Amino acid sequence: MFAVFHKLDNLIAMTDWNGKQIDGPLEEVSGIGDLSAKWEAWGWNVIVADGHDFDSILKAFELAKAGKGSDKPTMILFKTEMGHGVDFMAGTHKYHGSVPKPEQLEDALKQLGETPLGDF
């Protein structure tokens, strides 16, 4: 509200919108609804981008910078999937507040094309 009231059009905020909370899917836990519509109702410019696509991310920042002069702050909502790229983590909230077992970590790193970094 402060940013809108003071017309902070040079302010760019970001949210990782993965649809999950630590204890379950967002709609089952808090029923937040359309996050984009909420930010717009609060007076912000809203840009929705694919948080897994570098081109989409860069385009979102370009659009946000172009919003200067609009007298509105900008919120970029990055739509993501928790655990994206790792079959046993993708789409579940179970790893929101926990760590994988050592053998799971090794598997996850392989799936992401990374090399093991040693003991954790």
Q: In which residue ranges do the predicted regions lie?
A:
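Glycine-rich ThDP/TPP pyrophosphate-binding loop and its adjacent helix/strand module
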Residues: 1-120
